[in-house]
């Protein structure tokens, strides 16, 4: 992407900063967010992931109000890939590490793209299997479940405001 001129290089760098901002936000939200957004709510063993995938292949997957076991692993992998990709991208931009860092950045970015596709496919399959719109649930916070599984009104959104503001301010400083 950056070989096509300076304008595309700036777009690439801005996209890298945006990915870094999203990763920082998700890590913070995974600690201070709502009940099902917290990392502690979706710690699953590899055995439970394979069991869930087996159930899914048999068209009888268990229903999860929060993240299902396969989706939870996808989130952890995407966060790690996002961190590695942005760190390697910053190193390439700062000309630290040489050609192997560029190669690593390329491999990481394509691996992350593949994982994003896998995750989106998982969301579609899970949405169809459970007859629910998971994308809408991610955006509005509403999902099918029992009343005791509901999230009470969260004060977390007020905690997250400074983080979002800092990320947006950083992007504005970079753009100007």
Spell out what each predicted region is.
Residues 1-176:
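Membrane-embedded alpha-helical bundles that constitute the cytochrome b-like, heme-associated redox core
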């Amino acid at each position: 992407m950056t070989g096509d001129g300076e304008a595309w290089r700036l777009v690439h760098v801005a996209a890298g900063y945006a990915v870094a901002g999203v990763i920082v936000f998700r890590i913070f939200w995974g600690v201070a967010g709502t009940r099902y957004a917290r990392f502690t709510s979706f710690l699953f063993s590899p055995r439970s992931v394979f069991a869930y995938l087996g159930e899914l292949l048999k068209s009888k997957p268990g229903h999860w109000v929060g993240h299902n076991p396969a989706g939870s692993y996808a989130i952890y992998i995407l966060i790690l890939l996002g961190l590695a990709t942005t760190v390697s991208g910053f190193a390439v931009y700062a000309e630290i590490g040489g050609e192997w860092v560029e190669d690593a950045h390329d491999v990481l970015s394509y691996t992350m793209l593949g994982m994003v596709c896998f995750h989106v496919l998982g969301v579609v399959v899970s949405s169809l299997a459970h007859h629910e719109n998971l994308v809408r649930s991610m955006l509005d916070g509403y999902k099918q479940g029992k009343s005791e599984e509901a999230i009470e009104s969260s004060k977390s959104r007020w905690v997250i405001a400074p983080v979002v503001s800092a990320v947006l301010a950083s992007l504005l400083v970079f753009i100007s």
